Amino acid sequence: MKYLLTLCMGFFMLLSCNNKSSQSAAIATDEPEVNEDTLFRVIDLANNLKPCSDSLLLSDIVEDVEYVKLEAADNALVGEMYKGYVSDSAIFFSCIGSPIRPHIFMFDRFTGKFIRTIGKSGQGPGEMYSPVNVVAKDSLVYLSSDYRDELFVYKIKNGEFVRCIPLNKPYASAWYYYIGDNRVIHFPFYNVWDGKYSMCDMTIQDFDGNIIQEQTPEVDYTGFDYRNKPNTGFAVAWAYKNHPNVYSFFTDTIYAAFDDTIRPRYFLSLGKYKRPLQLKVSAEWKNYIIFHRFWETKDCLLGSFGLEQKAWFFRYDKKSKEIKTWKQDAEGLKASFPIPPAYEWIIGSAAGIINDIDGCSDHLRKMDYISENQFAICITQDNMDEIRKIVSESTNVKFPEKRQQLLELIDSMGPDDNPILAIYKLKD
């Protein structure tokens, strides 16, 4: 009996040891959680400009779509969206047109019912001309103007003016900005002439205009003077996991704001395709990479750019570090007047991404961010016929029921109706 008891105890001890070894092996083979906040990645784009044969699909970055038809109230007839923002409960919409119109039209987030206008044109308290962008946070909405170096703040519930927030580094910052807790994150690029241009990729400031942190690149100022400003363009900015990101034209680095700290996340190696900052706008620009937009999910970074008068996309896989690129024929910029030769490199339109979500497409480059993780296509009287044709011919989609819903909404549009917003949610 004693021998049998000893044998059983030994058997259970052996079983226990084997179980612990198995658990240890399982733990050892699990992949650690990746902390995006601390990673820095190098993307060698210059040596990977070899178009791949894979399809460039919208489902790679988008998980869902919904549609909101904006109510055509008498005092809320709008056209093509200029800028928009979608909160949890409302849609804030500014449209292309007269700068003296009401600045923002507010609609219900889900029904599209018109609620009110926000902002007045003029030069009195709380009044402004030419709104540029709109961002909503909590109970307030923040508007910018292309002629005032400050943000105008209004209450969402009644449109009442609250205050102005001075922008410490004003140039170009009104185009893109993010609102935090007593923080404005914006992207000035360069300030007014003061012996030399003050370069700046990203600024974090408080609501009183005090700078908390800024990213200022080291730039060769040779050749710059008050007549020859650096050619940077406007910010290519986006948010990922609620952290504002911006691509620096100066250093080809992507920076992100983490609370009151600015850190680099990516370096894009452009090699011979790097545009010299001192090169004035000319036909030569077609020989250099000009970035248009970025989208980001937990799996990849997707970017669009122009090169040699072609439309390009690249996809960087965060896990495998694989870089894929796509090249598309593109149309030049169209206007009612002859385009000067110096601007013929600008891309007007291209095929863009294949929309396998619902078939709707007005080219990916026209999909405008309307919140930190959503972008939209605005379907208007002007483009509805083109979009209807595209959607009707798109049969291989992830959400056929959404495709049918979209077709029915387009068919229901009358000559005086407001636009339909197709709102796409990024993965993550």
Q: Model-predicted segments: where are they?
A:
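Short beta-strand elements that form the blades of beta-propeller/WD-repeat-like
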Residues: 89-97, 139-145, 182-195, 235-255, ...
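Short loop/turn segments that connect beta-strands within beta-propeller blades
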Residues: 108-111, 155-159, 206-209, 258-261, ...
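Repeated scaffold domains used in trafficking and secretory/extracellular systems
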Residues: 79-83, 127-133, 170-179, 224-227, ...
